[in-house]
């Protein structure tokens, strides 16, 4: 996945061309998560907060996405660009919401129902963006899944969850159509 942010959003078309030149099977895009503690960082700001688009860049990003859809329509149609036009258009809307200019895009996600995240240090999360439910250094995975993950899933409601409402990654899948197939 390619994370689009303040420093590279204008280069999205060039990123597609680079992916082709590298003979990759495809390319996928995601907005930068600047608000959670995902990926081993503090949620209290820091360097990752600087990745958000400035309010004055949001309209330009929307234009960049529309240009991408026009110039790379074949790549979208063939699936080389993995996102649909609607999902690509969510990217500038996400940054608009982050800047207080719009509502966050609707999220339809079930990642915590079909996957878990195990970080390099053994931390286990229900998805990349939610708080840890435990650590492999303190409990075996089977116990974490059967106890802590089950407890998380019982109380989790993606329609009202604050983390889900501001999530950059709206994953809706099933075991039969999982992204790794």
Label every model-predicted segment.
Residues 25, 74, 115, 150-151:
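A general structural signal for well-ordered secondary-structure junctions
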Residues 1-110, 120, 131:
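Radical SAM enzyme [4Fe-4S]-AdoMet core and its adjacent flexible, acidic
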């Amino acid at each position: 996945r390619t994370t689009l942010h303040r420093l590279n959003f204008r280069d999205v078309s060039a990123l597609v061309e680079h992916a082709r030149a590298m003979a990759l099977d495809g390319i996928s895009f995601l907005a930068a998560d600047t608000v959670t503690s995902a990926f081993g960082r503090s949620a209290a700001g820091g360097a990752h907060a600087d990745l958000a688009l400035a309010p004055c860049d949001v309209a330009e990003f929307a234009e960049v996405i529309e240009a991408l859809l026009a110039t790379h329509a074949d790549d979208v149609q063939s699936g080389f660009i993995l996102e649909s036009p609607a999902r690509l258009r969510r990217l500038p809307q996400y940054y608009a919401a982050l800047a207080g200019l719009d509502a966050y895009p609707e999220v339809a996600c079930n990642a915590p129902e079909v996957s878990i995240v195990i970080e390099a240090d053994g931390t286990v999360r229900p998805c990349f963006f939610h708080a840890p439910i435990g650590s492999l250094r303190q409990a075996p995975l089977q116990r974490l899944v059967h106890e802590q993950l089950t407890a998380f899933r019982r109380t989790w409601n993606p329609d009202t969850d604050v983390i889900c409402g501001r999530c950059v990654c709206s994953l809706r899948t099933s075991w039969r159509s999982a992204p790794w197939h």
